[in-house]
A protein has these predicted regions:
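Sparse, context-dependent recognition of short Cys/His-centered cofactor- or disulfide-binding micro-motifs
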Residues: 38-40, 87, 204-206
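Low-complexity, flexible helical/coil segments
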Residues: 104-110, 135-142
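GIY-YIG nuclease catalytic motif and its immediate N-terminal context
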Residues: 1-83, 113-117, 121, 158-194
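Ordered hydrophobic segments in well-structured contexts
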Residues: 52-54, 66-69, 101-103, 209-211, ...
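Short, surface-exposed loop and linker segments with low hydrophobicity and enrichment for Pro/Ser/Thr
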Residues: 41-48, 89-97, 211-217
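Conserved short loop/helix modules at catalytic or binding sites
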Residues: 73-125, 228, 235
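Intrinsically disordered, charged low-complexity linkers and terminal tails
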Residues: 1-10, 60-64, 129-134, 140-239
Length: 239
């Protein structure tokens, strides 16, 4: 993948405030807006347009990251994305979110068809990555688009993926990525690289087996592993 030039504008002069994000040779615009700073965005004309948005927070029960993905169309009264975010802020059923990420365009080119398609694709990509709990109750409809428009929107999605990660949310990236291989021998060799295996027999429990690997985000225990349900006093306190 070629390098990309991303411009991050700290609208409040600090990393924890509002951020406007643009990319060279791209008509899209992204905003990262803390929930507490929504009222300071009332004068931004591009937030009165159509677009898609993501509400990020943390589950009180599981501690896992949660996200709600939605769309907002521009209205005749001049209200669009920001008005929809304000509605969510007032909704007690959506009090879990702490910040929003918004995607729109510099030329106000999104219509109902475009935002419906983007909402559907973003939702399915997030579900596939399984990194966040997706709070959408229903699967958004993709709408009917031409193949030319689909190609155009898929390019927009590719840029949006890069920006989403840059703004701190790897929503579309699975924790462990599949390894591309060509033969069965290469597949086994590639599959074993970097993995650590544990197999141990505990008298009161039986055999426990686990497989893990080091990733760029830390050590990950892979699916299918088994662990002891209770602490083992033979393990050093340092561990």
């Amino acid at each position: 993948m070629r390098g990309k030039s991303i411009n991050l504008f700290l609208m409040d002069g600090e990393a924890g405030g509002r951020i406007k994000c643009t990319l060279a040779n791209w008509t899209g615009i992204a905003y990262k807006i803390p929930r507490t700073e929504l009222d300071r965005c009332k004068e931004r004309e591009d937030l009165k347009q159509s677009g898609v948005y993501f509400l990020f927070g943390t589950s009180d029960t599981t501690g896992k990251g949660v996200v709600y993905i939605g769309q907002a169309g521009a209205r005749k009264n001049g209200e669009g994305i920001l008005n929809r975010l304000q509605e969510h802020k007032r909704n007690p059923e959506k009090d879990y979110w702490t910040e929003a990420i918004v995607f729109t365009t510099s030329n106000n080119s999104f219509g109902p068809t475009e935002i419906s398609y983007l909402e559907n694709r973003f939702c399915n990509l997030a579900l596939k990555a399984n990194r966040y709990e997706v709070k959408n109750g229903n699967d958004p409809t993709p709408g009917n688009i031409t193949e030319e428009k689909e190609c155009e929107l898929e390019e927009f999605i590719d840029y949006a993926k890069v920006i989403m990660g840059t703004l701190g949310h790897k929503l579309f990236e699975p924790i462990t990525k599949p390894v591309e291989v060509k033969t069965e021998v290469e597949e086994k060799q590639a599959d074993d690289i970097g993995k650590l295996y544990l197999k141990r027999t505990i008298k009161t429990i039986g055999t426990v087996e686990a497989v893990g690997m080091q990733t760029a985000e830390g050590f990950v225990v892979l699916a299918g592993s088994h662990i002891s349900p209770s602490d083992d006093d033979t393990i050093s306190e340092d561990i």
